[in-house]
Amino acid sequence: MEEFVDVAIEAAKKAGEIIRHGFYKSKHIEHKGVVDLVTETDKACEVLIFNHLKQCFPSHKFIGEETTAAASGNFELTDEPTWIVDPLDGTTNFVHGFPFVCVSIGLTIEKKPVVGVVYNPIIDELFTAIYGRGAFLNGKSIRVSSESQLVKALVATEVGTNRDKAIVDATTGRINRVIFKVRSLRMSGSCALNLCGVACGRLDLFYEIEFGGPWDVAAGALIVIEAGGLVLDPSGSEFDLTARRVAATNAHLKDAFINALNESE
């Protein structure tokens, strides 16, 4: 496993150089949807990451936001070792010069995350995890918060890029109900960094429904779990990497948080 995480870190840092180089420059922007953006940096980073990983692990499978999945509109997650990559999570932040952007690289074996690497090159924060061996921020062990009162919890969520009225109404309605039960709410614009925020205790809770795909959570979910947290479906059922639904919490807040989310449905 050490070889896997070392190679993933190398790839993330190389992609991070591209992101850092382009962060303060003008960008060529394309639209995947009305507000769903992609830049030449997203594409260049994914090519770099996949080339680096394929050189080291040619027999592995690969799923990426910008090429593998976006080109066909679907993907297949098998039991084979599979690298799941978001080359630039937080593209809208990148376009606006808002420094919550990251490279997210996860490895699954038998459909379970076993390696997670999330790197924010703008503030030089590297989150890593190997299954069963803990989670780390820049090499130092991290743990989820010990907060036990929902009313004191800081929660993160996102509104996503889907502008279908029914989905937007459901999202905002959920926020309107949850906000009265917690201390405050944040939206960073990056699913992967929200998960890492829970892992290191900056955030107590995170949930998101209808995010882009497994590339948003493959690395971050493992990092939360290895930091002592729980990753679930917002309904309280088992987390499904491919379902585009996630909730992250510590053990103390789990029941109250899941109840609050279910009451909001």
From Swiss-Prot:
Pathway: Polyol metabolism; myo-inositol biosynthesis; myo-inositol from D-glucose 6-phosphate: step 2/2. SUPFAM superfamilies: Carbohydrate phosphatase (SSF56655). Low expression in roots, stems, leaves, flowers and young and mature green fruits. Expressed in the stem/leaf junctions, below the shoot apex and on the abaxial side of the petiole of the first expanded leaflets. Mg(2+) 1 binds at residues 65, 86, 88. It holds the Pfam family Inositol_P. Its cofactor is Mg(2+). The keyword Calcium does not apply. Its EC number is 3.1.3.25. Mg(2+) 2 binds at residues 86, 89, 216. InterPro entries: IMPase (IPR033942), Inositol_monoP_metal-BS (IPR020583), Inositol_monoPase_Li-sen (IPR020552), Inositol_monophosphatase-like (IPR000760), Inositol_monophosphatase_CS (IPR020550). Gene3D superfamilies: 3.40.190.80, Fructose-1,6-Bisphosphatase, subunit A, domain 1. It catalyses: a myo-inositol phosphate + H2O = myo-inositol + phosphate. Keywords: Hydrolase, Lithium, Magnesium, Metal-binding. The keyword Magnesium applies. GO terms for biological process: inositol biosynthetic process; inositol metabolic process; phosphatidylinositol phosphate biosynthetic process; signal transduction. Transmembrane segments: none annotated. It is an enzyme of class 3 (hydrolase). Induction: Down-regulated by Li(+) and inositol. GO terms for molecular function: inositol monophosphate 1-phosphatase activity; inositol monophosphate phosphatase activity; magnesium ion binding. Belongs to the inositol monophosphatase superfamily. Responsible for the provision of inositol required for synthesis of phosphatidylinositol and polyphosphoinositides. This is Inositol monophosphatase 2. It comes from Solanum lycopersicum. The gene is IMP2.
